């Protein structure tokens, strides 16, 4: 009996490290990071560096695939139907979940996904060319009361907010759709549109003096543009709270979830990712884990539904 007990104890002691080692073997093949916008915008710029950093941590290639359309709604639709058990994940903002389903029919819902981590706080700006006769948002409104204007949108949410502002102020405003920041920038710089939404691409052009941030759609001022007001400060009761996050289909294996979260936390402290995110695209880097992000997504969705009257 004594020998049997000792043998059992030995088996148990050996099993624990083997289990830990097994968890560290995931992933066993390359992964795919989905970006819901065209190449060249802030999400794409951040995502490609993030993919390299996660690849370093996970020991497998992380390939970036752009799936633009509908302010990332196309990418989320495809992700919801993905059965790759964690090998395919999305990096990007959350307005396609917290807003888009409120105003249009989509083939996914919040509970179709898990929100593993947030790595950056979204920067939602209204921008214009430095060559325009207006620089502040108040000046844009004053100009628009006397002249027809054009606005370049990127997401259904920024478009909805600007349409409401235009109605309040009596503006004659035409909307020009873009596939992301890379499509927005030449329109603004070439003065083909009067002003536009930017989720971060403006950070490439404001230091050179080519582009100006007129106001922020975020709830708080950007630490990178402390003198630029928010729409709420200007008297409009609209704001966007968003986080650049890692999102996966609901129900992926535990080992995949744990390793992806660990890779995200590793990236949040990585100098290369912090440099591209904060110094190049002007997004404050954070790390918020799954519990906090699951709560944030549902809280923002509920608040947005209340504002939209749903």
Language model features: what each stretch is:
Residues 23-112, 157-158, 169-197, 204-206, ...:
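N-terminal (or domain-start) structured segment
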Residues 78-87, 101-183, 243-276:
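Hinge/capping helix and adjacent helix->loop/strand transition within the periplasmic-binding protein
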Residues 38-40, 94, 129-134, 153-157, ...:
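Short coil/turn segments
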Residues 13-22:
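C-terminal segment of classical bacterial N-terminal signal peptides
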Residues 1-8:
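Bacterial N-terminal signal peptides that target proteins for export
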Residues 119-125, 215-250:
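Periplasmic-binding protein-like
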Residues 28-30, 168, 254-310:
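An extracytoplasmic/periplasmic, membrane-proximal ligand-sensing/linker region
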Residues 186-227, 234-235:
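Pocket-lining segment of extracytoplasmic ligand-binding domains
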């Amino acid at each position: 009996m004594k020998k049997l007990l000792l043998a059992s104890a030995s088996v148990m002691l050996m099993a624990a490290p083997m289990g830990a080692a097994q968890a560290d073997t995931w992933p066993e093949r390359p992964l795919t990071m989905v970006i819901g916008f065209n190449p060249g915008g802030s999400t794409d710029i951040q995502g490609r560096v993030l993919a390299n950093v996660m690849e370093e941590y996970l020991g497998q290639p992380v390939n970036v695939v752009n799936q633009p359309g509908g302010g990332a709604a196309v990418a989320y639709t495809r992700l919801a139907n993905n059965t790759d058990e964690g090998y395919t994940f999305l990096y990007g903002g959350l307005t396609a979940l917290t807003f888009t389903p409120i105003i249009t029919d989509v083939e996914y819902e919040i509970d179709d996904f898990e929100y593993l981590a947030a790595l950056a706080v979204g920067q939602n700006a209204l921008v214009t060319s430095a060559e325009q006769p207006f620089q502040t948002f108040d000046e844009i409104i004053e100009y628009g009361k006397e002249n027809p204007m054009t606005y370049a949108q990127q997401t259904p949410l920024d478009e909805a907010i600007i349409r409401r502002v235009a109605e309040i102020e009596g503006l004659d405003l035409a909307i020009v759709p873009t596939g992301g920041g890379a499509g927005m920038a030449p329109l603004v710089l070439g003065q083909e549109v009067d002003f536009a939404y930017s989720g971060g691409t403006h950070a490439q052009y404001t230091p050179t003096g080519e582009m100006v941030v007129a106001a922020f759609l975020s709830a708080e001022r950007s630490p990178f543009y402390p003198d630029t007001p928010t729409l709420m400060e200007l008297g409009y009761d609209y704001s966007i709270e968003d986080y650049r996050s890692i999102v996966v289909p609901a129900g992926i294996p535990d080992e995949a979830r744990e390793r992806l979260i660990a890779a995200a936390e590793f990236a949040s402290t990585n100098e290369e990712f912090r440099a591209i995110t904060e110094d190049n695209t002007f997004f404050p880097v954070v790390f918020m884990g799954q519990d906090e992000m699951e709560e944030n997504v549902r809280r923002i969705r509920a608040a947005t539904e209340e504002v939209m009257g749903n």
